């Protein structure tokens, strides 16, 4: 029977470490790490996402500020706000909630954010650093995927990994992180020929295609680890709906372990976003040191230990 990798338990462990580190940071420097979230327009889903991110940051002791701009905000006004936040030494992380209104070039906006404050990891500088293994801020969902994966496979060297999904937000960054950890990586899309056969040879499958139940049980070999990033709402016969992943999880009991949906990668995403805020603040304060690539601990414990699979306690 496959083990369930609990993102909820892993997120709780990460947030506990963050709370202690934020308290130490605040004691040493006399101020808490500060996040500024920028929200343009009145999209209900965006408001919910921003509220959750701010609540999580405040929960661990960080300062969080929200800038709300009208839906008819000009690109020039938004860029001017970002420029002012870039110059403000009291601001350690900047998050611009996507999507943006049609009159605003999202790429131009993201490129304007100071890469040292780009907690989403979308700036070209951070993308380059990730691709070359030279550090930089890592997108939060891929980071969460790696923490959960390392909880059951501490040593990834030599593993065959398949990533289904080519997005700049999840698929490509996850592939880069897997490569850096020594995996042989195949990146696929929903329309890749012989996708089932490709997956059957994989030790690790990361499903991030946005297609409900794309990965069937016969695609997964015995003993594989499956990370399900998909969040899809499907209609039920009684008129209600439910959230499902990209993997038919009821068919993969022969896998070694998998992340459930909900309760898997989702809870880790916001927790890892908070970790990026803290890392950005440390860099600005010149008080952090890296214990290994993509490690987030001052003392060699905490987030670095989570990433390496130690003391996670996430498998049930």
From Swiss-Prot:
HAMAP family according to UniProt: THF_DHG_CYH
Protein species of origin: Sphingobium chlorophenolicum
Classification of source organism: Bacteria, Pseudomonadati, Pseudomonadota, Alphaproteobacteria, Sphingomonadales
Residues that, per the record, bind NADP(+): 165-167, 231
Source organism, top-level taxon: Bacteria
GO molecular function, one term: methylenetetrahydrofolate dehydrogenase (NADP+) activity
CDD domains assigned: NAD_bind_m-THF_DH_Cyclohyd (cd01080)
Name of this chain's protein: Bifunctional protein FolD
Matches recorded under PANTHER family: C-1-TETRAHYDROFOLATE SYNTHASE, CYTOPLASMIC, C-1-TETRAHYDROFOLATE SYNTHASE, CYTOPLASMIC-RELATED
Function: Catalyzes the oxidation of 5,10-methylenetetrahydrofolate to 5,10-methenyltetrahydrofolate and then the hydrolysis of 5,10-methenyltetrahydrofolate to 10-formyltetrahydrofolate.
Biological pathway: One-carbon metabolism; tetrahydrofolate interconversion
Keyword Nucleotide-binding appears in the UniProt entry: no
Subunit structure: Homodimer.
UniProt family annotation: Belongs to the tetrahydrofolate dehydrogenase/cyclohydrolase family.
GO BP term, example: L-histidine biosynthetic process
Keyword line: Amino-acid biosynthesis, Histidine biosynthesis, Hydrolase, Methionine biosynthesis, Multifunctional enzyme, NADP, One-carbon metabolism, Oxidoreductase, Purine biosynthesis
């Amino acid at each position: 029977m496959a083990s369930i990798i609990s993102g909820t338990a892993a997120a709780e462990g990460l947030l506990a470490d963050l709370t202690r580190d934020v308290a130490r940071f605040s004691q040493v420097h006399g101020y808490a790490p500060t996040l500024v979230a920028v929200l343009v327009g009145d999209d209900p889903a965006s408001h919910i996402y921003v509220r959750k991110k701010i609540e999580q940051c405040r929960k661990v002791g960080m300062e969080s500020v929200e800038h709300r701009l009208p839906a008819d905000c000009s690109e020039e006004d938004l860029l001017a706000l970002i420029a002012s936040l870039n110059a403000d030494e009291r601001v350690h992380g900047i998050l611009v909630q996507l999507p943006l209104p049609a009159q605003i070039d999202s790429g131009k906006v993201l490129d304007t954010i100071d890469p040292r404050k780009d907690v989403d990891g979308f700036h070209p500088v951070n993308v380059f650093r990730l691709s070359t293994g030279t550090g930089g801020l890592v997108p939060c969902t891929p980071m969460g995927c790696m923490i959960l994966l390392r909880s059951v496979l501490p040593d990834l060297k030599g593993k065959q990994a398949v990533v289904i999904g080519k997005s700049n937000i999840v698929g490509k960054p996850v592939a880069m992180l897997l490569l850096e950890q020594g995996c042989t990586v195949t990146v696929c899309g929903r329309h890749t020929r012989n996708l089932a056969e490709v997956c059957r040879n994989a030790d690790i499958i990361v499903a991030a295609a946005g297609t409900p139940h794309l990965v069937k049980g016969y695609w997964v070999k015995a003993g594989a680890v499956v990370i399900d990033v998909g969040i899809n709402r499907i209609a039920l016969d009684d008129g209600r709906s439910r959230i499902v992943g990209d993997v038919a999880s009821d068919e993969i009991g022969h896998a070694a372990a998998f992340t459930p949906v909900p309760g898997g990668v989702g809870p880790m995403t916001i927790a890892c976003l908070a970790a990026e805020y803290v890392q950005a603040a440390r860099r600005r304060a010149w008080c952090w040191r890296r214990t290994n690539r993509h490690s987030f601990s001052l003392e060699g414990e905490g987030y670095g230990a989570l990433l390496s699979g130690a003391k996670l306690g996430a498998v049930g």
